[in-house]
Amino acid sequence: MLIGQKVRIKYSKSKIANDIAVRVGDIGVIRGIKFINNQCVTIIVEFENHTRLWMFREELIYLNK
């Protein structure tokens, strides 16, 4: 997992808003990494329309290295 790497949204672990649910299957680019509580890592993914979402590692499929 690297900043700038392309990813596909696989699913969401939590209940999500409809506008986020439509992103499942979309391809985005990793723009940042955020650490929560020193154990949980979230990935900031940006899409073509410049929307950014925080996703967990297991919710993503990494497309290139």
Swiss-Prot record:
GO terms for cellular component: chloroplast. It holds the Pfam family Tsr0524-like. It is found in: Plastid, Chloroplast. Keywords: Chloroplast, Plastid. InterPro entries: Tsr0524-like. This is Uncharacterized protein ORF65. It comes from Porphyra purpurea (Red seaweed).
